[in-house]
């Protein structure tokens, strides 16, 4: 895993330029997910530096998955390292980091302007422990040109998706075309993979901090995903596919349907994309007789408890979490806003038309379990899902093992 600093000190393949004073009264270092367009965050930070004389901000990036980033940050925080001032955290992490004493509180912060889901995600034991960076949820991306060619409407159930995929794949006779790509690798995305059909059956995994495991819904979910592989709709090695693999395959024109987050849209519309202007976005399908639902995502900014520049770090986070930056990142990076009003903002909807319909999806997205022991919950679910997709476990055995392991964590 390689982590790199983005500064204006040098120009090379792994560094980006920035404008700022050569000598600053305060130099802050912020960790940003490498998957979420740090080059665009750099532009937002450039604006902050221009407005804040004497402050220089260096971006450190790294890790292509939530797990890799968390592993790195866990190491830094466990060592009480003061080198990082601001941390970009997956929405599932604030409770864990706050409980460990790794983040500073934003005392007195009014969270009412944010989408309620994100105000709640950043509040732990009544304390504001981080501020929203951007919202997110999973969507179904599809090849609009191919569905139109075969007279198919975007599917609202997984069964409809199967039928559509088989029809298009048979008609196209392209051995490289997959019907569906999703996250089967043992990463955080596989937790959402499991939960989507499980939630669609109306089941919850945790209630009031206690496990509420439904074995039938779990087996149904695992069987559904395995069936996509067995029926030739998804690739045989789907157990090796991570989030950005799905994005790259769809972008290369090799996938009909893809389950992915909002960041993928900008890539699909890029100059190197094979599907530019051929992509549609829809809500994720439901199981038969179930409800359409999706997995809540998003990222947050926390201030390291070990930062030696607490006030300056908090001012930077307040700025990056503000409405102006949220709008800037929506338009320039396709990152969903954390403010409801921006989903109807004329500039935003002109740049990203489908954002106009995204707010109800984000507002009704379901959150993964919030617990200080989330790492153990995640590891249990994602490795079990991966085992089923790799063919080393049956859905029935996997569901039993998953429940047993989760009960030891969520007592």
Describe the role of every protein-language-model region:
Residues 140-144, 296-309:
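A bilobed periplasmic-binding-protein/Venus flytrap-type ligand-binding module shared by bacterial periplasmic
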Residues 27-44, 62-64, 188, 290, ...:
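Extracytoplasmic "Venus flytrap"
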Residues 165, 210-239, 284:
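Glycine-centered hinge/linker elements that transmit conformational signals in sensory
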Residues 117, 121-122, 279-282, 331-383, ...:
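Long, aromatic- and glycine/proline-rich binding clefts that accommodate carbohydrate-like moieties
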Residues 89-138, 153, 162, 173, ...:
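Hinge/lid segment of periplasmic solute-binding proteins
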Residues 36-56, 381, 399:
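Short, polar/charged alpha-helical segment
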Residues 29, 47-117, 121-123, 145-156, ...:
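Extracytoplasmic "Venus flytrap"/periplasmic binding protein-like
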Residues 25-35, 55-61, 85-86, 129, ...:
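Short, well-ordered beta-strand elements
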């Amino acid at each position: 895993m390689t982590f790199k600093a983005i500064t204006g000190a040098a120009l090379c393949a792994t560094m980006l330029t920035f404008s700022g004073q050569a000598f600053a009264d305060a130099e802050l270092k912020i960790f940003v997910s490498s998957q979420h367009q740090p080059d665009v965050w750099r532009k937002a930070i450039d604006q902050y530096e221009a407005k804040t004389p004497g402050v220089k901000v260096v971006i450190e990036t790294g890790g292509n998955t939530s797990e890799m980033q968390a592993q790195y940050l866990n190491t830094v925080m466990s060592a009480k390292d003061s080198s990082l001032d601001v941390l970009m955290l997956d929405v599932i992490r604030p409770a864990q980091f706050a409980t460990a004493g790794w983040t500073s509180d934003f005392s007195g912060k009014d969270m009412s302007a944010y989408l309620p889901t994100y105000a709640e995600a950043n509040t732990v034991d009544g304390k504001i422990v981080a501020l929203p960076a951007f919202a997110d949820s999973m969507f179904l991306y599809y090849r609009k040109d191919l569905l139109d060619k075969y007279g198919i409407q975007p599917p609202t159930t997984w069964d409809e998706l199967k039928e559509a995929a088989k029809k298009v794949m048979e008609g196209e006779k392209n051995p490289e075309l997959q019907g569906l790509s999703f996250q089967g690798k043992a990463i955080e995305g596989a937790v959402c993979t499991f939960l989507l059909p499980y939630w669609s059956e109306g089941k919850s995994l945790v209630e009031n901090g206690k496990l509420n495991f439904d074995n039938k819904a779990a087996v149904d979910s695992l069987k559904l995903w395995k069936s996509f592989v067995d029926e030739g709709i998804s690739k045989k090695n789907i157990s090796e596919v991570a989030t950005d693999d799905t994005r790259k395959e769809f972008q290369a024109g090799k996938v009909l349907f893809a389950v992915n987050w909002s960041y993928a849209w900008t890539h699909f519309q890029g100059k190197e994309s094979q599907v530019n202007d051929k992509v549609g976005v829809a809500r994720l399908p439901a199981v038969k007789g179930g409800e359409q639902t999706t997995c809540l995502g998003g990222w947050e900014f926390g201030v390291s408890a070990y930062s030696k520049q607490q006030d300056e770090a908090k001012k930077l986070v307040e700025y990056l979490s503000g409405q102006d930056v949220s709008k800037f990142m929506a338009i320039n990076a396709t990152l969903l806003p954390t403010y409801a009003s921006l989903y109807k903002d004329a500039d935003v909807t002109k740049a990203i038309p489908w954002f106009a319909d995204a707010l109800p999806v984000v507002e009704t997205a379901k959150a993964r379990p919030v617990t200080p022991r989330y790492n153990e919950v995640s590891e249990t679910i994602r490795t079990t899902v991966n085992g089923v997709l790799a063919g080393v476990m049956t859905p029935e055995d996997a569901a039993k093992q998953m429940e047993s392991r989760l009960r030891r964590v969520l007592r």
